[in-house]
Structures are given as C-alpha cells and as structure tokens.
Regions:
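Contiguous beta-strand segments within globular domains
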Residues: 78-115, 151-155
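Bacterial Sec signal peptide processing site at the extreme N-terminus
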Residues: 34-52
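Short beta-strand elements
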Residues: 180-190
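Short glycine/proline/serine/threonine-rich loop/turn segments at secondary-structure transition edges
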Residues: 161-167
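Beta-strand-rich binding/interaction modules
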Residues: 120-128
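Short proline/glycine- and polar residue-rich coil/turn motifs
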Residues: 142-150
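Sec-dependent bacterial lipoprotein signal peptides
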Residues: 1-36
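Post-signal-peptide N-terminal segment of Sec-exported extracytoplasmic proteins
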Residues: 57-93
Length: 190
C-alpha cells in the first residue's frame, strides 16, 4: 500500500463550544444583514413643483444619471444587443398579462449622487411630458440625516405614462433647507 490519501483532521480553531457558537452566530447575522437592503418604495408625487432659490454648494454633487425608456411604440422589438434585451426582460419580469406589462412601460431614471456633509436632503426629479406641454411634474425622495454616496431611482410609468406621454425634458435637484444645492438637467430643459 502506498500510504493514506487522507490526513487526520484536528480542528484547532473550533475546539471550544463557545468558539463554534460565536462563528455560527456571526454567519447568521451576516446572512440576515445581507438581505436588509430593501428596494426603495415609490417616490412622492408633488401636486405642484415649487420654485426654490438657487444656492449651489460643492459639498453636494450628482455623479451620474442613467435614463432608459421602455416603450414598445418607439423601440424595435428584436435587437442583437444582449444588454438591451436583458434590460427589457428585467423591466418586464413578473408581468403575466398585457395589463401588467402596460403598467411597466415608461421612463426610468437612476441617479447617483453624494454629499460630504451630514444633513437632511431631498432629491427631486422635475419633468415635462409630451401630452402636458410646459407643465412641470415633480417627484421627490427624502433622505434624513444622510451623508455619503447614494443611488436613487424614479419611474414615470403606468397611467401617468400612458395618459400624458413620455418625458420630453427633466432636471434633478438636491434640496437642503429649502435651497437648491446641486442641479443637473437634460439638454431640452429650459
């Protein structure tokens, strides 16, 4: 016989029951915390977008704004781009009939922003839709006592999209104490 292929294991680190219990509880806690990042709820829709004073502050800034449209009237049904196919599949995931699918058509905005000073921040998306002309619609998200990098999402979908049309122009605002401290807008915003 050439020898044993397995070596006897001596669990040096896991000898005491207290060490095993600590390791097990750490794994359970880590698993629970990994599932705590819940998706954002719907943004608050404002009846009227109030005009606010402009006071730009370098401590607040937009990093990137991603826009996407999911409208079958203006998008070709077949594409060879895998990323576009995946994005459409992600947006329509879970829709079981044409009514649910129609509620997912619209414009989607993902906004990456950051602030270096801890404060109460309101992120507002103001937008104009094709069927409303120059009337400005607005949605907000409030972040109490926050600092650091953030990712926020806004959707203009469902009845709002089907009745008023797609978004023609938009602007994103960071608001602190009733003042606009950061601003980013689309080319068509005036």
């Amino acid at each position: 016989m050439c020898g044993k292929l397995t070596l006897p294991l001596k669990p040096a680190l896991l000898t005491s029951p207290m060490t095993r219990l600590t390791l097990l509880s750490s794994l359970v806690l880590l698993t629970l915390l990994a599932g705590c990042s819940a998706p954002e709820g719907p943004a608050t829709r404002l009846p009227k977008a109030n005009v606010l004073p402009l006071a730009i502050d370098d401590a607040y800034q937009f990093r990137k704004i991603l826009t996407s449209s999911f409208d079958p009237e203006y998008v070709e049904t077949e594409t060879k781009n895998d990323m576009i196919t995946f994005e459409r599949a992600r947006r329509s995931f879970g829709a079981v009939d044409s009514t649910e699918m129609a509620q997912r058509y619209g414009n989607y905005y993902t906004i990456f922003w950051r602030n270096s000073t801890r404060s109460d921040v309101t992120l507002r998306l103001e937008y104009r839709q094709a069927g409303l002309g120059n009337f400005v619609m607005a949605k907000e998200r409030f972040y109490p006592d926050t600092a650091g990098s953030h990712r926020s999402t806004f959707e203009v979908t469902g009845d709002e999209f089907s009745e008023n049309g797609g978004v023609t122009a938009w602007r994103a605002l960071l608001i602190v104490e009733g003042r606009i401290v950061a601003l980013r807008q689309s080319y068509m915003w005036r």
